[in-house]
Amino acid sequence: MIQVLLVTICLAALPYQGSSIMLESGKVNDYEVVYPQRLAPLPEGAVQQKYEDTMQYEFKVNGETIVLHLEKNKGLFSKDYSETHYSPDGRKITTYPSVEDHCYYHGRIENYEDSTASISACNGLKGHFKIQGETYFIESLKLSDSEAHAVLKYENVGKEDETHQICGVTLNWKSYDPIKRPSRLNLTPKQQTWPQTSVNLQLIVDHSMYAKYNSNSEKITKTVQERVNIMKEIFKPLNFDITLSGIEMWDKKDLITVKTAATDTLKLFAKWRQTDLLKRIDNDNAQLQTAVDFDGETVGLAFKSTMCDKRYSAGIIQDHSAIPLLMAVTIAHELGHNLGMDHDDTSKCNCNVCIMAPRLNTNPSKTFSDCSNNDYQKFLTDKKPKCIHKKSLKTDTVSTSVSGNEPLDDNVDGFHA
């Protein structure tokens, strides 16, 4: 029987509130310091996992006590999850780490129907939760008092240290090859019954991003996993699941030329995926993450309507923010293009700042518009992508078997940023 832990987070004294501090997510202001304390230990004789399957946390937000319910995201990793790096002489070194007792959770706030949460419990609590339309961050302060955490509104995360005009300036996904939007679909009730689909996602970290994080492989791995944990929450309303098939780090050197011209880099990366990656790692889609500053305001680029394609099921992402939520939305945007989604037209869609907005808002939404829903349904109907309709092979255990990829076709609609 799964044991539930009840933890209370008590507010610290007032002197700890209101000052500025630098966290992993950036400089923050107007935060509250809280202290997680376990109230209900496991019964005598019970075996405690390092990270329980379900947990509850109680704490105060703006003076109101709330209860955060968390459930371990057991579908986060594929059965063949792998991590790859390179030796000094260029040899691939691939390991298959145990991921059974991982530390990533989704959740909700008790008594708030529309609340959501994505939390990492790897080293204290880190993540975000949404309640009554407000997004809050929680993160360990990593002070001498190891139990201290900061709770703050998303808007209080300073953007002054973010590059590429992320502070006060929205970023856009530049469209290199504009594609005419397909006609809006009038979905019947039957069409609105979304099929369960899933994708095995492979993430590649290039050498510039590896250097940006001070060659700290463990930190990079946790950072990437946090982003995918959030992405799984984003895609849930589409009945679309994401499993992480693996992370590869180009820790010694890049295996392609990562150019500032995003179009060139995307083409090179897609070709590398086809000729190298697919021969050794089973994946339906791959996304390159890089610290290279793409030309203009572009922070991502992907092929449209190419999910499952052996050559073009790919995208590239600029590591433009230290905020996990903002990066998860960026990757979700490019993955949306792979799934047939076009940019939202604010005059026709029901959302001004949804996932597929042409410009990335620094206070991002985690919602897909009705236009994106229709585009995705049309993609499923027209393209019939086989790889995402297969039974999801999710697990949290070690496995060393790797099989080939199942391509769909070579028809490509074009680039989309």
Swiss-Prot record:
Keywords: Disulfide bond, Hemorrhagic toxin, Hemostasis impairing toxin, Hydrolase, Metal-binding, Metalloprotease, Protease, Secreted, Signal, Toxin, Zinc, Zymogen
Location of the protein in the cell: Secreted
Gene Ontology MF term list: calcium ion binding; metalloendopeptidase activity; toxin activity; zinc ion binding
Region annotated Disordered, chain positions: 398-417
InterPro entries listed in its UniProt record: MetalloPept_cat_dom_sf, Peptidase_M12B, Peptidase_M12B_N, Reprolysin_adamalysin
Free-text remark on how the cofactor is bound: Binds 1 zinc ion per subunit.
Tissue distribution of the protein: Expressed by the venom gland.
GO CC terms of this entry: extracellular region; plasma membrane
EC number of the protein: 3.4.24.-
Principal EC category: hydrolase
Disulphide connectivity of cysteines: 308-387, 349-371, 351-354
Binding sites annotated in the UniProt record for Zn(2+): 333, 337, 343
Peptidase M12B domain mapped to chain residues: 197-392
Signal sequence bounds: 1-20
Biased segments, Acidic residues type: 407-417
Cofactors (names): Zn(2+)
GO biological process: proteolysis
Active site per database record: 334
Proregion span(s): 21-189, 393-417
UniProt xrefs under PANTHER family: ADAM A DISINTEGRIN AND METALLOPROTEASE DOMAIN (PTHR11905), DISINTEGRIN AND METALLOPROTEINASE DOMAIN-CONTAINING PROTEIN 28 (PTHR11905:SF32)
Subunit comment: Monomer.
Function: This protein is an alkaline zinc metalloprotease from snake venom that possesses weak hemorrhagic activity.
Family according to the record: Belongs to the venom metalloproteinase (M12B) family. P-I subfamily.
Protein name: Snake venom metalloproteinase acutolysin-C
Record organism: Deinagkistrodon acutus
Lineage per the UniProt record: Eukaryota, Metazoa, Chordata, Craniata, Vertebrata
